[in-house]
Each structure stands twice: as C-alpha cells, then as structure tokens.
Amino acid sequence: MSEQIKKRTFKKFTYSGVALESLLDLKEEQLISLLRCRARRKLRRETPIKHVNFLKKCRASKAAVTQVGEKPALVKTHARNILIVPEMIGSVIGIYNGKVFNQVEVKPEMIGHYTGEFSLSYKSVNHGRPGIGATHSSRFIPLK
C-alpha cells in the first residue's frame, strides 16, 4: 500500500468575501461598502489631516524597505481613533497608550478596527486578598 502524503492547505484571508490582493486594489468607495456600519460612517465623513499624514508616513516607511522580509520602520502615533485600512497591512505602528508606545504589526485580520483596540490604556486589575473591614465577617479574622 502506498500512502499518499496530504499537503496542508491554508485558508486564504478574505474580508467580506474579497481576497486580500483584491482589497489592496479597491477604490475607496468600494472598500467603504465592504466595511461595517460604524467604519463606513467614519470613512464617509471628512478624514482629519492627522490621519492622512499618518497614512503618508506608513506608505513612506513601507517604500523605504530595501530587503525582502525586512519590516518597515516604526511609525508612531497618539491617535487611537485611526481606522485600519488594507493599505496599512504590513506596517509597524507605535500606538500611544498614555505611558508608552506599543508596537503593533498590522495584519489583515485588523482591517476595520481602530488603532486604540490594539494598545490598551489600562492594566487589568489583579485583586489581592481582602483586608480588615472588607466584610462584616472579616472582623473575626486574625491580623496575620
């Protein structure tokens, strides 16, 4: 019996049924029609100059890459409300969370999300043990 070796097939990324290569070629109006309602509304309204300049910096950093496989230079921003579009895929962005710039590499799955979603501005709470006076029964707990 000869065993046939099965090749692994990987699922190609699609956004709303459109392949990634096609997404990069779409015009702005066609892209807007694919996005969810909140993202459509944001892109239909006037885009702030700050966001346009950020996209220009992303384009420039991707164009400056000389070797294949090399990551583009970090592009920092304080704007947490920039919508991620297909043009930004592959860029490395630094999103300010109020303390530091968190480095994020933009992946296709991030399309339609805001930059702030990938840089949390708070630290999750790890509750310690309750102290004296936390509850009525804690009066009877010895101090140590």
Swiss-Prot record:
Domain of life assignment: Eukaryota
Q: Which GO terms describe its cellular component?
A: cytosolic small ribosomal subunit
* Gene3D superfamilies (alphabetical): 30s Ribosomal Protein S19, Chain A
Query: Which UniProt key words apply to this protein?
Result: Ribonucleoprotein, Ribosomal protein
Keyword Endoplasmic reticulum listed? The answer is: no
Instruction: List GO molecular-function terms, semicolon-separated.
Output: structural constituent of ribosome
Q: Which Pfam families match?
A: Ribosomal_S19
Q: Which BP terms from GO are recorded?
A: ribosomal small subunit assembly; translation
Q: Which family does it belong to?
A: Belongs to the universal ribosomal protein uS19 family.
Spell out the protein name for this chain: Small ribosomal subunit protein uS19
**Originating species:** Dictyostelium discoideum
The lineage, from the top, is: Eukaryota, Amoebozoa, Evosea, Eumycetozoa, Dictyostelia
Q: Which gene is transcribed and translated to give this protein?
A: rps15
